[in-house]
From Swiss-Prot:
Keywords: Glycoprotein, Membrane, Signal, Transmembrane, Transmembrane helix. Glycans are attached at residues 247, 389, 529, 601, 720, 974. It comes from Caenorhabditis elegans. PANTHER family: METABOTROPIC GLUTAMATE RECEPTOR. The chain crosses the membrane at residues 690-710, 721-741, 753-773, 784-804, 832-852, 864-884, 891-911. Residues 114-140 have a biased composition (Low complexity). PROSITE patterns: G_PROTEIN_RECEP_F3_4. This is Uncharacterized protein C30A5.10.
Length: 988
C-alpha cells in the first residue's frame, strides 16, 4: 500500500513539472528579472513585445525630405519641419518650429520607427495636439557593407529555415539585453522594397498582409510603378483606421493582443508584387507564421501572385468582384456571378435579346458563366471576342468585328490597359456616336487616373456601369478620413506623390513616378477634399474586410485556445488557417458602413449586396453617374429607377434594346428556348384553334355514325360490313385532333395507335366485301369475324411499334424544316406511322383489284372508288409530308384525315346498289321497262288479290309457297321476253 501511495505521489509530481506553455511564453518567464523596479518592468514589457525595435534606415532620397514635423512657415516640402491644419492643408505661422503650436495642428510622421505608431493624440472640439516620437539612432556602424538596413522584428533569421544559425549580431544583442527577443539587423539589397512596404507594428506576431495598389502600373515593362493612385491612399487610410478601431476595441483588449499590418504596394503589376512578396518573406525575418490573413485590394489579373498566395495557404479576403475561384478565398463584395446576373436582369427588363462580349484574360472564367446564364435567360451572345493583349492593332480588329455584328449592346469585361486601348480604337475607326452601348464594371480610377481622364472627351459611345450600392454612412466616413489622412505615418515619397496627384501640381524636380509632369507648382496652402480628389472611391469593402478578420480572430481564439497567451496564430493549432478561414465565413456583425448586417454567403464565401447600375456621361469635363436601377441580390430582380430614353450630352438617346434576328446565335437561342418549353396536354386544352378543329372532328364522327344507321336499315346485302366501315370512318375522324395537338406522351400515343386502328377498321370491311363479291359468296357472320381479325393484326403491329420505339415519347428536332418538339423518332415520325400501316395499304391495293374484277356488281363501284381514295391518301402523305415544314406538317396530316373520312362517306352512297332499286314501300313494283308493262297488265281485281296474297303469306305457309311459285313463274317469263327482271318481290 505504501508503494502505491508513493507511486501516486511521483505521478502527481511529474504532472506538475510538465510545462504546457509555448516556447515564447516560457522564454519570457525564464528571462524575467529577479528584482522588481520600474525600469525592469519597462524592460519586461519590451520583452513581451518582440516588435519594439522595428526601424528603417531610409535611403538618401528620404533623408532630404524629413516629415517628422512640418514647418509652420511655408510648404512642407520647403521646410524641415511644419504643421498642417486638420482639414485644410494651410499651415499656420509659428516662431518655434520645434514645438507644437497651440492651434489645431497635425504632425506628419515620417517613415520612422514604427514602434511609436500610432502616436498619442489628444483631440478636443477645436484643437488636437500630437506628441512627437523620439529619435532613434541607427547602428549602421556595426554592418560592414554599405547597404540600406532594416531593423526587423521576428526572432527568426532572414531565410525561411527551421533550424537557422544565429547571426553574430543576434548573439551580441542577446548578451546586451537578456530580457528581450533576439533582433536581427538584416541587409536589404533593394531600395525598392523599402519604397513598397509599410509595416504597422504589433505587440504579437500577428500581421495582416494587405496588398494595395498604391501606384498605378507604368503600362510599359509591367514592372515599374507609374503614378500614385489617390483612391488607394484613401482606401489604405480606411484600412489603417479600421485596424486601429479593432485594436482599441474590447474585442482584442480582453485577450491582450493587437493586430499589426504589412502593406505591400503592388503597383497593379504581377511581377513587382511577386518580387515584393518574395523579398519580404525570404529577404527579411518576416515569416509565414507571422501572417494571419491576406487582404487583397488589387483586382489586377496577377496569376503569379495568386500562385504565391496559394502556396502561403492563408485566408484571403478580396475587396473587389472576384473573377476566379480559389481555396480559402472570401470577399466583402460578391463574386462576378452577381454582376453577371445583374446585367442579364437589366437586359431582360429592357427586352434586349442579343449582346456582344469582349473580354481579356482576367474575365475568361466569368465569360463562360455569362454565356451559360444568358442561354438560360433567353439572351443571345452573338460575338464573344477574347482580347489577348492590350495593343492598338488588336483593339482595332476587335472594333471592326463589332461593327459587323447586329447587336448594339457590348458587355466589356476588360482590364484597365485594355479598356484604354479600346477607347482609342473606337476613335481611330471613326465609329458613329451612339453606335454601341457598353456595359462594364465601374472602376474608381475612371475619375482619377490621367489615362482615363484624357480618353473620356473622345469617347462618344454610351456607357453603363455596375458598382456596389453606396452605404448611407459613406459620406461621413469620407469626412472622417479627410481629417485622418494627414496623420498617417506614410513614406515621404508616397506623401509627396499624393499631394502632387491630388492637387495636380509638382512638388519639386525629383522623379516621383510621373508626378512632376504637372506644369503647375504646388501652392503652399491647399485644402484637402476627398470628395473632389477621389469622387468615386469606395472605402466600405476594405474596412469591412479588416473588421471581419478582427472579429474572426477573437472567435477563433475563444474556440481553439481560450485564455491562452497568443503570440502567433499557430500557438494552439498546428494548421490554424483552415479553421480561421471558417471563422471569417461564420462572422456576423453590424457595421456603420453597411446598411444590412455583415455576413458571408456560406455556399459562395462572398457577401451578397445590392448592386447599382449607372449611366456614365462625360459632362463639363467630369464624369457623371446617374442611377438607372438597383439589382436585388436575393431574388436577382431589377428595379428601374429612371428613364432609359433620356438624351445624352451629344443629343443621342440611350436605348437599352438590342436584337439580332438574322444571326446564328439567335437561331440557336430560339432552339434552346423551344427546347425549354416542353409541350403539355394542358396547353392544348386552352388553345382556341385546337378546340375548333376538335369540334369539327367530333361533328364528322357523329355524321359518320348517323350515316351508318341509315345505310344499315336501307341495305340488305353485307349490311354488317358496311356498318363496320362507317364505324372506322368515325374513329378516323376522332384520331385527327391527335395530330394537331402539340406533341406529348398522350397525343403521340394516339397518333401511333389510334390512327392505324381506325384506318384498318375502315379498309378491312371493304376488302372482305370485295373478296366475297368476287367469290359470289353472300354476307354471313363469318365475314365480320374476318374483318375483326385483320383489325386485330393491325392493332398488334401498331402496339409493338409503340412499345419497341424510343423510350421518350417526344424528341427535340432541329432541321431545315424547323425547330420544335416532335413525336419520336422526330423528323420521320409521320413516315413511321404510315409504314406501320403497310398492311392496310396492301389490303387497299387488293380491294382495288377485286373491285375492278367484279365491276358489274352493284357495290363494286363504290368499293373501287374507296380503294383508290385509300391508295392515294396513303401514297400522297408518305411522299409529301417529308417535304413540308414541321408546323405545317401536323396541320396537313390532321386535315387530310378529315377530308378522307368525308370523301369516303360520300363515295359510300354512289354506285348501283340494290338499296337504290328498292321502292319506298318495301320493294313492290318499279317502273323499269314500259314494254314489260304492256304484256303484264292486271285488272284492279287481280291487283287486290295480289295484295291479299302478300298479307296472307306472312301467316300461312301454304299461301306463301303458292305466292313464291307464282312469282318465280312471272320472273322466268319476263327474263325470257326482255332479258332482265321486270320486278322483284320482297323476300319474306
Amino acid at each position: 500500500m505504501i508503494r502505491l501511495v508513493f507511486l501516486f505521489l511521483l505521478v502527481v509530481l511529474s504532472v506538475e513539472l510538465l510545462d504546457f506553455r509555448s516556447n515564447n511564453y516560457r522564454q519570457i518567464i525564464n528571462n524575467a528579472l529577479p528584482t522588481i523596479d520600474p525600469q525592469m518592468i519597462s524592460q519586461a514589457q519590451a520583452a513581451i513585445n518582440p516588435y519594439t525595435d522595428i526601424f528603417v534606415n531610409p535611403p538618401n532620397s528620404f533623408v532630404d525630405f524629413p516629415m517628422a514635423n512640418i514647418a509652420s512657415s511655408g510648404a512642407f516640402w520647403q521646410q524641415p519641419q511644419s504643421t498642417v491644419s486638420q482639414v485644410a492643408w494651410n499651415p499656420p505661422v509659428s516662431t518655434n518650429p520645434s514645438s507644437s503650436p497651440a492651434a489645431s495642428t497635425i504632425s506628419f510622421q515620417s517613415y520612422q520607427n514604427p514602434s511609436t505608431f500610432p502616436s498619442t493624440t489628444t483631440a478636443s472640439t477645436t484643437t488636437s495636439t500630437t506628441t512627437m516620437p523620439p529619435t532613434y539612432q541607427t547602428t549602421t556602424k556595426s554592418v560592414k557593407k554599405n547597404t540600406e538596413t532594416l531593423w526587423t522584428t521576428s526572432k527568426s533569421p532572414m531565410k525561411l529555415s527551421k533550424n537557422p544559425k544565429p547571426s553574430k549580431l543576434n548573439q551580441k544583442s542577446s548578451k546586451s539585453s537578456a530580457t528581450s527577443f533576439d533582433s536581427a539587423q538584416l541587409s536589404v539589397l533593394s531600395h525598392r522594397l523599402l519604397n513598397d512596404v509599410l509595416i504597422i507594428p504589433s505587440s504579437r506576431r500577428l500581421y495582416i498582409l494587405a496588398i494595395i495598389p498604391i501606384h498605378q502600373s507604368s503600362g510599359q515593362q509591367n514592372f515599374e510603378c507609374g503614378e500614385i493612385d489617390v483612391n488607394a491612399i484613401v482606401r489604405m487610410a480606411a484600412f489603417l483606421e479600421a485596424q486601429k478601431t479593432i485594436n482599441e476595441s474590447n474585442l482584442l483588449k480582453e485577450i491582450g493582443v493587437d493586430i499589426g499590418a504589412i502593406i505591400v504596394d503592388s503597383c497593379s503589376t504581377d511581377l513587382r508584387s511577386v518580387a515584393d512578396l518574395y523579398e519580404l518573406l525570404s529577404g527579411t525575418n518576416i515569416q509565414k507564421s507571422d501572417l494571419i490573413a491576406i487582404i487583397r485590394d488589387d483586382s489586377t489579373f496577377m496569376p503569379n501572385t495568386e500562385q504565391i498566395i496559394r502556396q502561403l495557404n492563408l485566408p484571403v479576403v478580396n475587396t473587389f468582384f472576384t473573377t476566379r475561384s480559389a481555396v480559402q478565398t472570401s470577399g466583402t463584395l460578391p463574386s462576378m456571378f452577381l454582376p453577371i446576373q445583374s446585367i442579364i436582369s437589366a437586359l431582360r427588363h429592357y427586352q434586349s435579346t442579343c449582346v456582344n462580349i469582349i473580354f481579356d484574360e482576367k474575365y475568361s472564367e466569368s465569360v463562360s458563366e455569362f454565356q451559360q446564364v444568358a442561354l438560360t435567360e433567353g439572351i443571345c451572345v452573338e460575338v464573344a471576342i477574347h482580347v489577348k493583349n492590350a495593343s492598338s492593332t488588336v483593339s482595332e480588329m476587335v472594333v471592326r468585328r463589332l461593327l459587323l455584328s447586329e447587336a448594339r449592346i457590348v458587355v466589356a469585361l476588360l482590364s484597365e490597359d485594355t479598356w484604354i486601348q479600346m477607347t482609342k480604337a473606337l476613335r481611330s475607326e471613326m465609329v458613329i456616336a451612339g453606335r454601341f452601348v457598353f456595359i462594364s464594371m465601374q472602376d474608381q480610377r475612371w475619375t482619377t487616373s490621367r489615362k482615363f481622364i484624357e480618353s473620356w472627351p473622345t469617347f462618344e459611345q454610351h456607357l453603363i456601369s455596375i458598382t456596389p450600392k453606396t452605404p448611407i454612412n459613406h459620406e461621413e466616413e469620407i469626412k472622417k478620413l479627410t481629417e485622418n489622412i494627414p496623420k498617417l505615418s506614410l513614406p515621404n515619397l508616397w506623401l509627396k506623390q499624393f499631394w502632387s496627384s491630388a492637387f495636380k501640381c509638382h512638388v519639386d524636380n525629383e522623379d516621383m513616378g510621373g508626378s512632376n509632369s504637372f506644369s503647375r507648382e504646388c501652392a503652399t496652402t491647399q485644402s484637402l477634399n476627398i470628395s473632389q480628389v477621389a469622387p468615386d472611391v469606395d472605402v466600405a469593402s476594405i474596412s469591412l474586410a479588416t473588421h471581419a478578420i478582427g472579429i474572426a480572430f477573437r472567435s477563433f481564439v475563444d474556440r481553439v485556445c481560450p485564455g491562452a497567451l497568443v503570440i502567433s496564430l499557430s500557438d494552439c493549432v498546428n494548421d490554424p488557417f483552415v479553421g480561421f478561414h471558417q471563422s471569417i465565413l461564420d462572422s456576423d456583425f453590424v457595421h456603420h458602413l453597411s446598411d444590412i448586417p455583415v455576413s458571408f454567403n456560406y455556399s459562395t464565401g462572398f457577401r451578397d449586396i445590392s448592386l447599382r447600375i449607372n449611366r456614365v456621361q462625360f459632362v463639363e469635363d467630369r464624369l457623371q453617374f446617374s442611377e438607372l436601377g438597383i439589382v436585388d441580390p436575393i431574388q436577382f430582380t431589377y428595379q428601374d429607377s429612371s428613364d432609359t430614353a433620356t438624351p445624352s450630352a451629344r443629343g443621342s438617346y440611350l436605348l437599352m434594346s438590342s436584337t439580332c434576328p438574322k444571326s446564328t446565335c439567335a437561331k440557336e437561342l430560339a432552339k434552346s428556348t423551344i427546347k425549354q418549353q416542353l409541350p403539355s396536354i394542358v396547353k392544348a386544352l386552352t388553345d382556341l384553334e385546337i378546340m375548333i378543329f376538335t369540334i369539327f372532328s367530333v361533328l364528322s364522327a357523329l355524321t359518320c355514325l348517323m350515316c351508318m344507321y341509315l345505310k344499315v336499315i336501307s341495305v340488305s346485302e353485307y349490311r354488317n360490313l358496311t356498318a363496320v366501315t362507317f364505324l372506322g370512318l368515325a374513329f378516323l375522324s376522332i384520331s385527327a385532333p391527335a395530330f394537331i395537338i402539340p406533341p406529348n406522351s398522350i397525343s403521340c400515343s394516339l397518333r401511333k395507335l389510334l390512327f392505324p386502328i381506325a384506318i384498318s377498321i375502315t379498309i378491312a370491311p371493304v376488302f372482305v366485301k370485295t373478296v366475297l363479291i368476287w367469290k359470289s359468296i353472300g354476307s354471313s357472320s363469318s365475314s365480320v369475324l374476318i374483318a375483326f381479325c385483320i383489325v386485330l393484326i393491325q392493332t398488334v403491329i401498331s402496339t409493338e411499334w409503340l412499345l419497341l420505339a424510343s423510350d421518350s415519347a417526344t424528341e427535340f428536332v432541329s432541321t431545315l424544316h424547323g425547330t420544335m418538339w416532335r413525336c419520336s423518332p422526330g423528323d420521320s415520325s409521320e413516315e413511321m406511322i404510315l409504314l406501320s400501316c403497310s398492311l392496310i395499304a396492301l389490303l387497299s391495293l387488293l380491294s382495288f383489284i377485286f373491285a375492278l374484277a367484279t365491276l358489274k356488281h352493284s357495290q363494286s363501284l363504290q368499293h373501287l372508288m374507296i380503294s383508290i381514295l385509300a391508295i392515294l391518301f396513303e401514297t400522297a402523305l408518305y411522299v409529301s409530308l417529308p417535304l413540308i415544314p414541321y408546323k405545317t406538317r401536323d396541320t396537313v396530316m390532321a386535315t387530310t384525315i378529315l377530308i378522307f373520312a368525308f370523301v369516303a362517306l360520300l363515295l359510300s352512297h354512289t354506285g348501283k346498289s340494290s338499296a337504290k332499286k328498292e321502292s319506298e314501300c318495301g320493294g313492290t313494283l318499279q317502273k323499269t321497262n314500259e314494254n314489260w308493262l304492256q304484256h303484264v297488265v292486271q285488272s284492279p281485281q287481280d291487283q287486290m288479290t295480289l295484295v291479299k296474297n302478300y298479307h296472307t303469306a306472312s301467316t300461312h305457309a301454304q299461301s306463301t309457297m303458292q305466292f313464291e311459285k307464282r312469282s318465280e313463274d312471272t320472273l322466268r317469263r319476263n327474263t325470257s321476253l326482255y332479258g332482265t327482271e321486270g320486278y322483284e318481290l320482297p323476300t319474306p
